[in-house]
Amino acid sequence: DGAADAQLFAAQFGAPMSVYGGIIECSKPINAGPHTYVLRSALRSLDSWIRTGVPPASMPKLQNTADIMGYETDANGVALGGIRTPYVDVPLAVLSGYGQDGGSGFCGLFGTTLTFSAEQLDALYPTADDFLTKWNEATDAAVASGAILEIDAEAIKAAATQYEAMRSAS
């Protein structure tokens, strides 16, 4: 029914700071990037490779900084390179593997979500239609690259239609 996809999308507007019913408490909101879609595509590609011998499409590496201790980012703080999905290419937040400097010992595994301000979102997406156009184009590009499956693309696009309501609620 798409409810889970809508919850994943909504998490970018208010990512949780705890997981597993509060067993693990972190100092900052955890990375709300839905890795499920990329994982499903990777597993499908792995299965196909085993069955046919045809390797999956290769994905670009994250772009390291000169000292190789971090990653190059765009003007919004989003990492350059790596597997691209609409959650990365049409960001509502900076989804990062870094950033937990406190909380439970496992928090370092969860990364962080830094939600954009209303002003940042307005500059990136002047209208909801502008956001949806960019989101749908990025979703189609992710399918074309093999990063996500076509069946997941439908749900990802449907969840994004809630952008305006979620923006208003945040």
Task: Cite the ranges covered by each PLM segment.
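C-terminal His-loop and adjacent cap/lid subdomain of alpha/beta-hydrolase
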Residues: 1-170
